[in-house]
């Protein structure tokens, strides 16, 4: 709905009444972590952390909520946020089990000054997993990478039905130009970790904004003339529906969010007269 309803500031246009406030599950300090893949053994924790934060400092807090409700801690893990490099098949490889990716911007075989591999992990097999194309959802061990030609060779496998992937003969189960994939079980360059950490921070900020506010329930009665300016003359169709979200601001208890419509009644004779119940719980 294109309007924010503010508690205590109606101007005669609507009445927003508090029906229930539950601060039991409020979180004012949220520890935030990401996934555990592609970090390497030199990363500061087994899971992705917030930018520049060690394990025990990987949290976001809301000072205003702490002042109102005290320090209340919880943890949120975003398993799907991790360093990832999404690549693309740009050309066929030298064999049915190979493909080329001209966008590859680091040498998978690179070693440091001590002769240790920088991106391959000891004891782990690097893999590619496809997200689009005929082999979407399939994961393959990497057999060989040639940085000069940007060719990746994978290890074919045979499933329980005797089907071989990728197929040597059927184009329906082969790599295709434009197919998307990503690496797993490798140590990606730091730029990918930085990107993932920033994404984790953004999602963490969204989460603390939600968790630091109490669970609420409101009753909302809106003036008919106020409704009419939004609905026009389309009185047959309901302007509101259960499951819609309406922006609510209640400064006294720190609420500034969209709250779900859990129920409403509409007068059959006065098409613009609505009584709405808003709540965080269904």
Predicted regions and their residues:
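Short, conserved phosphate-binding/catalytic loop or strand-edge motifs used
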Residues: 1
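An acidic/polar, Gly/Ser/Thr-rich interaction patch typically located in mid-to-C-terminal regions
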Residues: 9-282
């Amino acid at each position: 709905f294109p309007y924010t309803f503010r508690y205590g500031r109606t101007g005669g246009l609507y009445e927003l009444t508090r029906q229930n406030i539950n601060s039991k599950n409020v979180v004012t300090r949220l520890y935030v972590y990401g996934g555990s893949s592609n970090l390497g053994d030199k990363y500061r924790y087994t899971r992705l952390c917030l930018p520049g934060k060690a394990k025990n400092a990987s949290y976001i807090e809301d000072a205003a909520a702490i002042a109102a409700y005290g320090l209340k801690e919880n943890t949120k893990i975003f398993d799907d946020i991790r360093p990832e490099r999404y690549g693309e098949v740009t050309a066929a490889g030298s064999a049915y089990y190979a493909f080329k990716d001209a966008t590859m911007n680091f040498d998978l075989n690179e070693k440091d000054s001590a002769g240790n591999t920088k991106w391959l992990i000891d004891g782990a097999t690097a893999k590619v997993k496809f997200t689009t194309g005929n082999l979407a959802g399939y994961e393959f061990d990497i057999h060989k990478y040639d940085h000069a030609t940007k060719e990746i060779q994978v290890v074919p496998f045979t499933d329980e039905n005797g089907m071989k992937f990728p197929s040597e003969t059927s184009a329906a189960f082969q790599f295709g130009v434009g197919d998307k994939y990503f690496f797993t079980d490798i140590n990606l360059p730091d730029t990918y970790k930085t990107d993932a950490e920033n994404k984790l921070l953004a999602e963490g900020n969204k989460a603390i904004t939600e968790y630091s506010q109490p669970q609420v329930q409101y009753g909302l009665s809106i003036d008919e003339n106020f409704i009419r300016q939004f609905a026009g003359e389309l009185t047959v169709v309901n302007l509101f529906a259960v499951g819609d979200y309406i922006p609510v601001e209640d400064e006294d208890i720190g609420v500034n969010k969209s709250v779900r419509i859990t129920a409403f009644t509409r007068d059959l004779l006065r098409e613009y007269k609505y009584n709405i119940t808003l709540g965080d719980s269904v």
